[in-house]
């Protein structure tokens, strides 16, 4: 199984409000970047969407080292998700996104690590800027 590194971040202008997501996917020297956004969303939804979109970009099963500044995403993946499934996601927010994450992550082995945001981590800073730009673009387009 290939070992890939996935850096992800989300941004939301208002919570809820216009939001953006971004990821950087790296395997050896190869790298892929992408970003997008939504007109009405939350910061947690965009953080999770960034990870989902990064996983969707993978073309084969991989061992994924996910780096996120969202403790919500990191803790959910590493600790809470299994119990949420057992409880049928009772009282869990963003169920549809978590179910999408579970489906897309099935072929992969994902380990999430939390990194402090806005602390000089180059890939996190780049993802943050990309996600924020998407949120600003959507805000301007929709005059939110």
From Swiss-Prot:
The keyword Iron-sulfur does not apply. It is found in: Cytoplasm. It catalyses: Endonucleolytic cleavage to 5'-phosphomonoester. It comes from the Bacteria. Its cofactor is Mg(2+). One of its GO terms (biological process) is DNA replication, removal of RNA primer. It holds the Pfam family RNase_H. Its EC number is 3.1.26.4. GO terms for cellular component: cytoplasm. The keyword Hydrolase applies. Binds 1 Mg(2+) ion per subunit. May bind a second metal ion at a regulatory site, or after substrate binding. Mg(2+) 2 binds at residues 9, 128. One of its GO terms (molecular function) is nucleic acid binding. Residues 1-136 form the RNase H type-1 domain. Belongs to the RNase H family. NCBIfam families: PRK00203.1. Endonuclease that specifically degrades the RNA of RNA-DNA hybrids. PANTHER family: RIBONUCLEASE H1. This is Ribonuclease H. It comes from Campylobacter concisus (strain 13826).
């Amino acid at each position: 199984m290939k070992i890939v590194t996935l850096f992800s971040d989300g941004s939301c202008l208002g919570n809820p409000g216009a939001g953006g997501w971004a990821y950087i996917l790296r395997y050896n020297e190869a790298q892929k970047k992408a970003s997008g956004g939504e007109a009405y969303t939350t910061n947690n939804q965009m953080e999770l969407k960034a990870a989902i979109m990064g996983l969707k970009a993978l073309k084969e099963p991989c061992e994924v080292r996910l780096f996120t500044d969202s403790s919500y995403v990191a803790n959910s993946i590493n600790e809470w998700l299994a119990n949420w499934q057992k409880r049928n996601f009772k009282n869990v927010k963003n169920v549809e996104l978590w179910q999408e994450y579970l489906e897309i992550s099935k072929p992969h082995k994902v380990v999430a690590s939390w990194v402090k945001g806005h602390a000089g981590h180059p890939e996190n800073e780049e993802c943050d800027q990309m996600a924020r730009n998407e949120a600003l673009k959507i805000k301007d387009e929709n005059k939110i």
